[in-house]
Design a protein with these regions (language model features):
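Long, amphipathic, charge-rich alpha-helical segments that form helical bundles/coiled-coils
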Residues: 52-69
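N-terminal first-folded block
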Residues: 1-24
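Solenoid-repeat scaffolds in large eukaryotic assemblies
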Residues: 25, 32, 76-79
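Amphipathic, coiled-coil-like alpha-helical segments
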Residues: 76-95
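Amphipathic, heptad-repeat alpha-helical segments
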Residues: 29, 33-40
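Short, solvent-exposed, charged loop/turn and helix-capping segments
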Residues: 38-55
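Amphipathic, charged alpha-helical scaffolds that flank and support histidine-based chemistry
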Residues: 66-80
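Helix-capping and short linker residues that terminate individual alpha-solenoid repeat units
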Residues: 18, 37, 44, 88-91
Length: 95
């Protein structure tokens, strides 16, 4: 569910940036950053081992990308694509 919400927030930020709606874009970016922080906080390093460490690195890289390039729609799309890949991987694991 958090991956879906993260994808929605990023899509909203992209649409707002493309439409020149800076306030709306900033709001969606803040939401995306908050979701990434929640995903990271939910990692169980004791039980998750290497997977948790890898996901932590991915989440932090995404957070850095959002922080460093908040106005770059191409970079936002890259993060959104990465989230979509993660979501698909989790769906495949539980299927």
């Amino acid at each position: 569910i958090l991956y879906e919400e993260l994808q929605n927030a990023l899509a909203g930020a992209i649409r707002a940036r493309e439409g020149g709606q800076d306030v709306a874009a900033n709001s969606q970016m803040a939401r995306a950053k908050s979701i990434l922080a929640a995903l990271e906080a939910g990692l169980d390093f004791d039980r998750g081992g290497t997977l948790a460490t890898t996901l932590c690195g991915i989440y932090r890289a995404m957070q850095r990308q959002l922080a460093n390039t908040p106005n770059d729609v191409e970079k936002l799309n890259e993060v959104r694509s990465g989230v979509a890949n993660l979501a698909e991987s989790w769906r495949a694991l539980v299927a």
